[in-house]
Curated annotation (Swiss-Prot):
SMART domains for the chain: AdoHcyase (SM00996), AdoHcyase_NAD (SM00997)
Organism, as annotated: Arabidopsis thaliana
Name of the protein described by the UniProt record: Adenosylhomocysteinase 2
Residues annotated as transmembrane: none
Binding positions (substrate): 64, 139, 205, 235, 239
Stored Pfam families: AdoHcyase, AdoHcyase_NAD
Amino acid sequence: MALLVEKTSSGREYKVKDMSQADFGRLEIELAEVEMPGLVSCVTEFGPSQPLKGARITGSLHMTIQTAVLIETLTALGAEVRWCSCNIFSTQDHAAAAIARDSAAVFAWKGETLQEYWWCTERALDWGPGGGPDLIVDDGGDATLLIHEGVKAEEIFAKNGTFPDPTSTDNPEFQIVLSIIKDGLQVDPKKYHKMKERLVGVSEETTTGVKRLYQMQETGALLFPAINVNDSVTKSKFDNLYGCRHSLPDGLMRATDVMIAGKVAVICGYGDVGKGCAAAMKTAGARVIVTEIDPICALQALMEGLQVLTLEDVVSEADIFCTTTGNKDIIMVDHMRKMKNNAIVCNIGHFDNEIDMLGLETYPGVKRITIKPQTDRWVFPDTNSGIIVLAEGRLMNLGCATGHPSFVMSCSFTNQVIAQLELWNEKSSGKYEKKVYVLPKHLDEKVAALHLGKLGARLTKLTKDQSDYVSIPVEGPYKPVHYRY
């Protein structure tokens, strides 16, 4: 794979699609900043003291216009940053170009192959002979995964000289990961151990990545502290819910121009993401059916006037299918064969294994017709009818549209900045062990408060008597940790 790192005139490394788009990217970044009051407030409050000075931060998170504002917030607080995207389709090339030119090392472009994707991840983690990053901003956990798998392989190699075997797995993506680690072992057999020793911690953006972290914590495999940003209320109840409510119909309409009103839409999963997706489809005039494993979530869907059925009940009747579960094997090729002609199948969960893309790609005689980038019609030979799959089963709202709007991402990314500050400020205190943590309630409330003024809100303030009566401090926090919102 002949990929070469390029350098700006100032010597900063990068690999993006088209640097001539940098001016366009800068214009959109300036527009987004106005919609991201939380990040702007972080620069105002913390910028003068440069609290991240000396910190090396690697980011593996969708390289969008909104992420560009996050990156420039981190650099404004003193950090040095290297960045890659966490999805092969989610990069906005003009955003990548602007940041690569002006602010940070970026390795990302829309439409990467899996081989290119992991090359970019490796580059973002590569800080030269001095080891890796001090901090990671992760989304989905791929940067964290690469380090953990690298350390594991190095330990085996040190013990008996055995290299990782890419053929030991059927997963084509993990084969690439093992190949990268194998190649690295031949150059520096302690590469990932050096990264582990330097790392202060990671802050994780999304549900899927958080699941990985908790799994590693349970088995004692977690190598460094982690802050679970996803379960901050101002992330999961805003980005996951309202962001998806905005971006699902946006992606559907950009990709297909289909009229949603009157259609039958199946939302697989009714967590925060599923709730946002179902609300969007209902508002657009679709008849919404939810599939769920959890009786509580199922009952919530029913209380919203939605039907709750199994996929098998509705697979031949629905027009639009969207997976939101964070699980695997939700819509299989046998389901797709039974769907209406030109039924739309898409995913808004982090990875591409909710939809059985491998089964679809290897189905005997199936024909793939690319309508436009990230919009494909797959025709089955035995029925001569087809389905439309968006973004190859990956995140359709970023593959087919531009993801969540700036304002709601400001909530999520302000949490990320606070998490990075917390990890860096406490790096020598012993406060954070090799465990997964959630930001405290008062910081969650602070993130929300930073966004109220932009929307013209004015908070009511407790009197001292009221505060004493309900045993809630006048300045908060206002809810107990277990409050569900």
